[in-house]
C-alpha cells in the first residue's frame, strides 16, 4: 500500500529504472486491483476495484491520450462520465427539449453494466481506432489484471471494466456510444 506522496519518491527511483522500460518493451504487468465496497444510498453495495497509485497514473495517462481520439465521435446527447459535461447539462438539455416540444428523453441505468462489459467486444472497438498494438495489449492487461479482496484472495477478470479505474469511464462510453 502506497500513498501518492510516497509514490513520488518511489517513482524517482523506479520510473527510469523499470516502469518506463517495461512499458516501452511491452512487459509491464499491472498489479491486481484492490476490492473496496461502498454502500449506496438505497442500502445496497457497490463493488469498486482500486488500482495502485502507479497503475492509476498510467491508466490516467492512457485515458488522456485516448480521450481526444474517441470523444469527438460520441453523441452530443450523452452526458455520463464525459469531460466538460455534467448532470446539470443533461437536465438543461431535457428542459430545452420540453420547451421546444421534443418530448422524447431516455434515462438509462444499465444494471451492473461495468461488471458485464465483454473484453473481446471492447478490444475490437478499441482496435478500430488505436493502431499501437503495444497500447492495446496494455489496455488488455489492465482489463485482465484481476482483483484482490481484503482477505488476500485473487479473482480473475474475464469480463467487465473495473469501477474505480480512471480508464473505465472512457472505456464504458466507447461501448455505450452505439446506444
Roles of regions detected by a PLM:
Residues 1-13:
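Non-catalytic, polymerase-adjacent accessory regions of viral genome-replication enzymes
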Residues 45-74, 158-179:
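Conserved pre-motif C helix in the palm subdomain of viral-like polymerases
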Residues 43-44, 113:
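Short, internal active-site loops enriched in acidic
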Residues 15-23, 58-66, 139:
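Short, Φ-rich (hydrophobic/aromatic) sequence segments
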Residues 3, 49, 86-89:
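Secondary-structure junction/capping motif
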Residues 1, 37-39, 47-51:
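Short, conserved beta-strand segments within well-ordered enzyme catalytic domains
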Residues 18, 22-26, 30-32, 36, ...:
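Conserved polymerase palm-domain catalytic core
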Residues 29-30, 40-42, 54:
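A short catalytic or substrate-binding loop motif that flags glycine-/basic-rich loops and adjacent residues
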